[in-house]
């Protein structure tokens, strides 16, 4: 299973709220909902998040063996 828990940890570390992400970076609420519920996202979206947050993929997601 893919977990996006590191994404929220990265936001905390960088002191970025989800509101600020939506407002300043045009990240949709739908995307945040997908991340919150560990639903799939595209590699393009993953790339965009890494660019926006200036981070690596492992700062966005992690693999957890079922």
Please state what every model-predicted region is.
Residues 39-51:
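Short, basic-rich loop-to-helix N-cap that marks the start of a DNA-contacting helix
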Residues 12, 23, 37, 62-65:
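Residue-level detection of the helix-turn-helix DNA-binding "recognition helix"
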Residues 1-20:
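A short, Lys/Arg-rich alpha-helix, primarily the initiator
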Residues 15-33:
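Short alpha-helical DNA-recognition segment
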Residues 54-66:
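Short C-terminal boundary/hinge segments that cap the last helix of small helical domains
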Residues 19, 47, 58:
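Residues within the helices of the helix-turn-helix
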């Amino acid at each position: 299973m893919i977990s996006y828990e590191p994404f929220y940890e990265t936001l905390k570390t960088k002191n970025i709220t989800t509101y600020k992400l939506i407002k300043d970076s045009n990240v949709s609420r739908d995307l945040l909902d997908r991340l919150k519920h560990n639903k799939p996202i595209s590699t393009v979206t993953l790339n965009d998040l890494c660019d926006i947050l200036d981070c690596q993929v492992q700062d966005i997601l992690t693999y957890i063996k079922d």
